[in-house]
Amino acid sequence: MNSKMSEELKIPKDRVAVLIGEKGSTKRKIQKLTNTKITVSSKEGDVLIEGEDNYRIFVTGNIVRAIGRGFNPNIALKLLKEDYALDMIGINEFSGKSKKQEERIKSRAIGTDGKARRTLEKMTNTNICI
């Protein structure tokens, strides 16, 4: 029995163009690699992912979330590998409600010219987007 499953999510409007790619190339590539259908509302940033396999929809959702949070699509596509995962940590969990504290934490995590972030990525074998 073939039954369609779906997931709806929202990404920032300024990341919609990155998700779609030049002439739709990024979206097509994701759809082909995951065997899903992605529908994007450019005005609102709403994304609908449809398919017949829950796991593929889950992985596609993580790829879309990663792109929406600032990752390059080629890095986000690494999530297709079973030993890769997406983990999002809210800086406000550590900064409280203070915008100054949030900016300070972001600055420390990035470092001068991104050196701290690059060092963290190398030491932990991860990709980090702040």
Question: Regions from the language model: what does each represent?
Answer:
Residues 1-130:
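RNA-contacting regions in translation and RNA-metabolism proteins
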